[in-house]
Amino acid sequence: MVKVGVNGFGRIGRLVTRAAFNSGKVDIVAINDPFIDLNYMVYMFQYDSTHGKFHGTVKAENGKLVINGKPITIFQERDPANIKWGDAGAEYVVESTGVFTTMEKAGAHLKGGAKRVIISAPSADAPMFVMGVNHEKYDNSLKIVSNASCTTNCLAPLAKVIHDHFGIVEGLMTTVHAITATQKTVDGPSGKLWRDGRGAAQNIIPASTGAAKAVGKVIPELNGKLTGMAFRVPTPNVSVVDLTCRLEKAAKYDDIKKVVKQASEGPLKGILGYTEDQVVSCDFNSDTHSSTFDAGAGIALNDHFVKLISWYDNEFGYSNRVVDLMAHMASKE
């Protein structure tokens, strides 16, 4: 089992760690975070307002974080080049600070003995992989990769199924997205993106997202055919993608439901879900799928123009894919 270090013990860092312990697919051996001391790590890992208390044991012992009896080395380095991943036995590093998202910046981890880096965010220049969509294109000459964004992980599997069966001529995506850490609790300064600085709990905030364009990077045939935007809404977790697209081949809405359901039970099982239930966002909290197609929510204007709806736990589904990508990469060593 591949040994993993986590850089940045925020929402994604902690939930990747949870997902690793839940699934047993990778072995977490080290964590670096300069802003959280060991005792605080114990507390933050144990208690989670969104996903509930960790079902297991967490304690600090001999300067290490001990989860379910397993000791994890703790570093508190600000500069990624100074983290001694090699000494801790970490072969792969999850870069989940949200800061070091380029090849150059994430590459600093290699100096400390890591063999590969997985950026848990979209990257301007690192190759992006979405499980179930283009993970087979990974080859082990790549030292630094990106797991794309939570929204790309929701949209891409659905877009792939639709494009493979009916062909997407063009499409627009909207994600109605839960609050994340980059937002402000009350109105505050936000650099160039003034709207993003408005109170997160009080507003529906139109925002940009590169998620739809990024689908063109993981599904090259869709390059230039999709774009999109986001509305940030006052919910703590779980988001939903609305893909409105023009189809090449005529398709009844029932035909679309059928192929998505087949994919969810076959090649994309565990990644793309399917439901005909009368669900709402809360029903997907702590759901491990990248995307769950809501058959009852979508609509067709005609046989060539449809609106498709898919839910995702933007924290936990994504964190589980980070683990899956690392396990896939390890299988290619």
Curated annotation (Swiss-Prot):
Residue sites binding NAD(+) per the record: R11, I12, D33, R78, S120, N314
PTM-bearing positions, type S-(2-succinyl)cysteine: C150, C245
Phosphoserine PTM sites in chain numbering: S120, S146, S149, S239, S310, S331
Residue numbers spanned by region Interaction with WARS1: 1-146
Record pathway: Carbohydrate degradation; glycolysis; pyruvate from D-glyceraldehyde 3-phosphate: step 1/5
Signal peptide range: none
Residues that bear Phosphotyrosine: Y40
Modified residues (ADP-ribosylcysteine): C150
PTM text: ISGylated.
Reaction(s) this enzyme catalyzes, per UniProt: D-glyceraldehyde 3-phosphate + phosphate + NAD(+) = (2R)-3-phospho-glyceroyl phosphate + NADH + H(+); S-nitroso-L-cysteinyl-[GAPDH] + L-cysteinyl-[protein] = L-cysteinyl-[GAPDH] + S-nitroso-L-cysteinyl-[protein]
Family, similarity comment: Belongs to the glyceraldehyde-3-phosphate dehydrogenase family.
Protein name as catalogued: Glyceraldehyde-3-phosphate dehydrogenase
